[in-house]
Amino acid sequence: MTEHDVLDGRTARRDRNRLVVLDAVLQLFAEGDLSPTPETVARRSGLSLRSVYRYVSDRDDLVRSAIDRHLEMVGPMFVFEAIGEGTFDERVATFVAARLRLHKAIAPTARAAQARTRLRATPASEIIRESLHARRGMLRVQLARHFEAELTTFGTQADAILAAADGLTQIETIDWFLVDGGYTVEQTSEALVTGLHRLLGTVATRDQGK
């Protein structure tokens, strides 16, 4: 075995152990521990505390790195390829279904990110805040493009209607329905579908629902 092979083996082991650490953090997020300590992560990962600190510099870095890891894993779920396709009813249904799937995939990590930004400001928390802002902006753009035909009918009220629809369908709102509100997935889906119909439907469509 050459020196190069030895170095490659060490690098691969380090990369594997780093992922073990970050995946342990994600497991703790899912269990409700939104700000796990390095000691807790060490116990969960089966690695020593010293090993954990080889891969992250502090608690903030631990949480931020785990969030980044999760976003890499679920990145494709942020892509909504059916933008603008189908009738209004079909577009509402596909949009709500996509948002509920996205929530299911990212909810624990999103809660941890939210919790981290509410603590004292640190370089890591500011990075998380910027990432959240970018993700929310991307979801807002998807909404605007998907329902562009409807939004153009509202004239000067279009921005206000978009803001209301955006607030209704963001991940944090869905999380409120399912966690704090105690609604089922089916009830949440119905609420989002009804809300989007009321906000974005044509006058004729809204009148039919009265």
Description of each model-found segment:
Residues R50:
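Key DNA-contact positions within bacterial/archaeal DNA-binding proteins
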Residues Y55-V56, S65, A191:
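Residues in the recognition helix of alpha-helical DNA-binding motifs
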Residues I67, F78-F80, H103-R129, D175-W176:
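Amphipathic alpha-helical segments used for helix-helix packing
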Residues R101-A105, A112, T122-T152, A158-A163, ...:
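Amphipathic alpha-helical packing segments from all-alpha helical-bundle domains
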Residues P38, I67-G75:
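Short, basic, alpha-helical segments at the C-terminal edge of helix-turn-helix-like DNA-binding modules
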Residues M1-G46, Y55, D60-D61:
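Basic, helix-initiating cap at the start of DNA-binding domains
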Residues D61, F78-A105:
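Hydrophobic alpha-helical connector segments
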Residues V141, L162-Y183, R198-D207:
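Amphipathic C-terminal alpha-helical segment
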